[in-house]
Amino acid sequence: MVDSSSYGLLQYFQKLSDEEFQRFKELLQKEQEKFKLKPLSWTKIKNTSKEDLVTQLYTHYPRQVWDMVLNLFLQVNRKDLSTMAQIERRDKQNKYKEFMKNLFQYIWTSETNTYMPDRSYNTIIDRQYKALLDIFDSESDPATAVVLGTRGKGKTVFLRKAMLDWASGVLLQNRFQYVFFFSVFSLNNTTELSLAELISSKLPECSETLDDILSNPKRILFVLDGFDYLKFDLELRTNLCNDWRKRLPTQNVLSSLLQKIMLPECSLLLELGESSCSKIIPLLQNPREIIMSGLSEQSIYFYCVSFFKIQLGVEVFKDLKKNEPLFTLCSNPSMLWMICSSLMWGHYSREEVISSSESTSAIHTIFIMSAFKSIFGLGSSKYKRFKLKTLCTLAVEGMWKQVYVFDSEDLRRNKISESDKTVWLKMKFLQIQGNNIMFYHSTLQWYFATLFYFLKQDKDTYHPVIGSLPQLLGEIYAHKQNQWTHAQTFFFGIATKHVITLLKPCFGNISFKTIRQEIIRYLKSLSQPECNEKLVHPKKLFFCLIENQEERFVSQVMNLFEEITVDISDSDDLGAAEYSLLRASKLKNLHLHIQKKVFSEIHDPEYGSLENFKLDQKFSAINWTMLSILFCNLHVLDLGSCHFNKKVIEVLCNSLSPTPNMPLTVFKLQRLLCSFMTNFGDGSLFCTFLQIPQLKYLNLYGTDLSNDVVEMLCSALKCSTCRVEELLLGKCDISSEACGIMATFLINSKVKHLSLVENPLKNKGVMFLCKMLKDPSCVLESLMLSYCCLTFIACGHLYEALLSNKHLSLLDLGSNFLEDIGVNLLCEALKYPNCTLKELWLPGCYLTSECCEEISAVLTCNKNLKTLKLGNNNIQDTGVKRLCEALCHPKCKVQCLGLDMCELSNDCCEDLALALITCNTLKSLNLDWNALHHSGLVMLCEALNHKKCKLNMLGLDKSSFSEESQTFLQAVEKKNNNLNVLHFPWVEDELKKRGVRLVWNSKN
């Protein structure tokens, strides 16, 4: 039987005579060739019924079926059917549009409330509207657009307007036949569905069949909002599906749609907030951004004169503009609505409801108080408190369950009656969403959920869903972004004398000291070294402290932390960091990342008006100047991946320069890290901070240094006041010429550890360094030269240096093309008794087993060499056998041997086992990434269990072995308390000594 979704086509087939139907099938063969489709065999078509042919067409050609059929109707002289089908399809599409128009007209007028004429709103969103048209201007290519912006900036309102305009016939008419709008958080309680079911839920009864609708996916747009409130993780998945009919877990359906596995030719328009942006964008294909940057001054004016009568609106606007902090809040549409609503109530009650400087929490409180007074008047505070508490319980239960749409059972369970619901709707605390209820704005749910904890009493009934305050604080500060991300500011904002005083007339005494104590207690636990949980997003905390603004409490919180890592992405972030960090008197270590946008000198219209850009520049400069005051008191300043301009560098220099009131002896800075820094300047910064007597460590990894800047650096290092001992200049684009400059200056410096990894020094650069090493004044102890484009020729220079240098103990030559001939030269130097080298790193140097004879000779005669790393070389079993002979020699003193990734097999395990038992000094052996099997592992484990084995670290990836082998290793570890079997055992130490750092992201 034909599927009901395909009935639309069948009804036209029924109107064909048998002769016409037969002719239709014959022509179908040619039509398949015309459309370049894989043909259905004639045997399948010849005797098939009309019902079966419909099924076959939709199965094999779902996207071309109507184009083919309409064309074939013409060829069998049934133009009437072709015309009739087109008219009927168009009528059904228009009926869907009409249905959506009525629905979104109701949503626009009843639930959106922009409080301004459409022409004024259209002026406000003109830039975003043009961006939308530009993205979807193509007639055929699928596109993905994301509407971005902080909370309350009008993203959902913009999408609703776009949906209404499409349904009204004024937007993207030639581009999309169907536009579907879904608030994805409404699916939070749906565990399984199909895309077909999801679409069907939006279709009126008179619509086309799903097969017909989806037969042309390039003419379909999905509008999706509410990702911030979605409780599913829509991560990159491999278990995706392209079948829109198939029922799947809800997150799989959404992921399949977003990742273009399901209906890849459709287009997407998504609303993403702060929480969801970083999670969803990686799933999308070539997303283009539409930025909602908030209301301009002109837009605020439009809003005020529309919300109030014109004369009163003008007066309100003027008053708001005089109040700069309040006017700043007005750029957020939801905040402007609350402010105007409160002012309207104050106007009619002849009360001054908003003072000169109010926080977001205070604005919400004033709005709620105004609404309560207008409805409940002078009723008892006990009664009003009871009513408020039911609303707060609904809100907090929803937050913990990640529910934002409530049904009648949710209201009943939380003691909200029908009459209560009517009151809350009138007060604009709640709004109707279809057959359900939502909070009027998401921030109201966050506010009421937070207020629950202030109203909570010990005698209250236990609620199994609602977590404790410490649990909630853990969700906010120690875990990934979640549904509580935006609510956190209200905890700090309500916990102020001002807000509690505002609440008192309506709801009686409310204590906030207990909440503050809980916050302090929890944050203190995060700051302890032994605590497994850490402060993941300090920026969240900074904005909370700005919301609080009570100096004593803010200082009390910030003084809990000695180390903080923070990412600064815009001017607001910098202001929040400046406010909070200046109150952290116990702060010692600051890791600061400043993104390009913060100090950019080029205006990008995507991020707002030129006027706002200039204001941001002004405030960023002021905040940076203030923030830099604390640098002199830090022990560690990490400016990794910071984007600076010339003026910012000047401020940084000034902050680290001595003054009559701030002599050099007062500065505490010991470690400075400037990795991957842009616009580093001309090097004058070195002359400033290298004077600081406490500064011992400087890391510039990934920051490009010209020859002139290198010369400035070296000149400063040579200065008598400079005390730098560790200098890490990896990946700084230092040439062999710059290396020559450096070698000349470093001879008389105090530098003991020098890393030049990942620089194109070449053999010529090493020649200069070796001249430095041969100078008796050189005190260098560690030299890191991995990835420096060296060959065996460099080893000839190093040979001479090793013979004469009395201080060098660590030499890293990893990942250079040294070959056996180069290592043999080094071995000749190591055989001399006066060679002081203790560690030699040679991983990835293109060595073979041939060089192991010379290395073995070194191991048996050199008493100083304690560490030898030969990983990632073609040593093989034959080479290891020679090395093991040396390890068994009584004069071998090596303690640490790296043989990871050396193409070893079981054949060398017997030799290794003997060496483990015989060598009294060997403490660490790395065999990671070698193809050892169970039998070889058994031999090693037997040796590890031997009483003469001194090994305390074995490098192996336990997870790569069979279950039986893993059991063996676990048993050995259990028996030998001092033994650790580790994967990548030395990576952390190697990166630290090389000074290698990662480009900043939120995880490092």
Curated annotation (Swiss-Prot):
LRR repeats by residue range: 750-770, 779-800, 807-828, 836-857, 864-884
Biological function: May be involved in inflammation.
Positions contributing to ATP binding: G149, T150, R151, G152, K153, G154, K155, T156
Entry protein name: NACHT, LRR and PYD domains-containing protein 9C
Principal localisation: cytoplasm
Domain Pyrin: 1-92
One annotated GO biological process: innate immune response
First and last residue of the signal peptide: none
Magnesium keyword on record: no
One Pfam family cited in the UniProt record for this chain: PYRIN
Localization of this protein: Cytoplasm
Natural source organism: Mus musculus (Mouse)
GO CC entries: cytoplasm
Family as reported in the entry's similarity comment: Belongs to the NLRP family.
InterPro entries, alphabetized: DAPIN, DEATH-like_dom_sf, Leu-rich_rpt, LRR_dom_sf, NACHT_NTPase, NLRP_HD2, NLRP_innate_immun_reg, NOD1/2_WH
Tissues/organs with expression: Oocyte specific.
